[in-house]
Regions:
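Long, well-ordered, tryptophan-enriched scaffold segments
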Residues: 198-218
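Cofactor-binding active-site loop characterized by glycine-rich and histidine/acidic residues
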Residues: 66-187
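Basic polycationic patches enriched in arginine
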Residues: 10-15, 21-22
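N-terminal amphipathic, basic-rich helices that act as targeting or association modules
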Residues: 20-104
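Short internal beta-strands
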Residues: 92-94, 191-196
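A contiguous, mid-domain pocket- or channel-lining segment that forms the substrate-recognition surface
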Residues: 182-186, 193, 205, 211
């Protein structure tokens, strides 16, 4: 078994249907855990994504937050929680500033749709909030190395759950991410890396790795 590396492309520009202040929500109020979306049809997932997008914009307009990174991972987060079985399967979001959709689907939707609860959750993953948040994260490039640790612990315990690291292309060049990739390749075990290749980072990406990613993209 080898580590699996998946790359998702840049999200299209977002369109919001109807008013941001329409009666919330059709689906979000009914979601208390990821199991609630497992049976959704494609159209239901699209409607859920629209609700999540509108809720993010509404909430952020009141209290601030990381709007761009979260708008860009809504569909990817719905897909992750549809395919995998959290919290048995472990998901680690790099930096974790893009965890708002994840929190919406893991029992914390009220913090995004009810103004009275907007400040009930932090802007990053927090193990104090939910068993779905494996680590308290706020730094870049840590997800892959954390995932290798979880995968090693799983293997030593004889378990079979999936371990998923979700990382952006900007974070991928960080030293700890490169060390994590090196260790993951040596482990030859079930470890899934999802690359959010959205072409956004604090500074422009340079180097041989990004030249390779451009070739894959093209």
């Amino acid at each position: 078994m080898y580590p699996c590396f998946l790359m998702i492309g840049r999200a299209e520009r977002f369109r919001i249907s109807g008013s941001f202040r329409r009666a919330f929500p059709l689906y979000l109020e009914q979601i208390h855990s990821p199991s609630d979306i497992k049976a959704y049809m494609a159209e239901q997932r699209r409607a859920l994504a629209e609700e999540m997008r509108a809720a993010l914009i509404e909430r952020t307009s009141h209290i601030g937050g990381h709007i761009g990174p979260n708008l860009g991972v809504i569909e990817a987060t719905i897909a992750l929680h549809t395919v995998f079985d959290a919290p048995t399967d472990k998901m680690i979001f790099d930096v974790s500033h893009q965890c708002y959709p994840h929190k919406m689907l893991t029992g914390r939707a009220a913090a995004y749709i009810d103004a009275a609860h907007y400040r009930d959750v932090s802007g990053f993953t927090s193990s104090e909030e939910s068993v779905h948040d494996i680590f308290n994260i706020g730094h870049t490039s840590t997800s892959i190395s954390l995932a290798t640790g979880l995968a090693k612990a799983r293997d030593l315990a004889g378990r079979r759950e999936n371990v998923i690291a979700f990382i952006g292309d900007g974070s991928l060049s960080g030293g700890e991410a490169l060390e994590g990739l090196n260790v993951a390749g040596e482990m030859q075990t079930n470890l899934i890396i999802v690359l959010n290749d959205n072409d956004w980072s604090i500074a422009e990406n340079h180097g041989g790795m990004y030249a390779m990613l451009r070739r894959l993209r093209e």
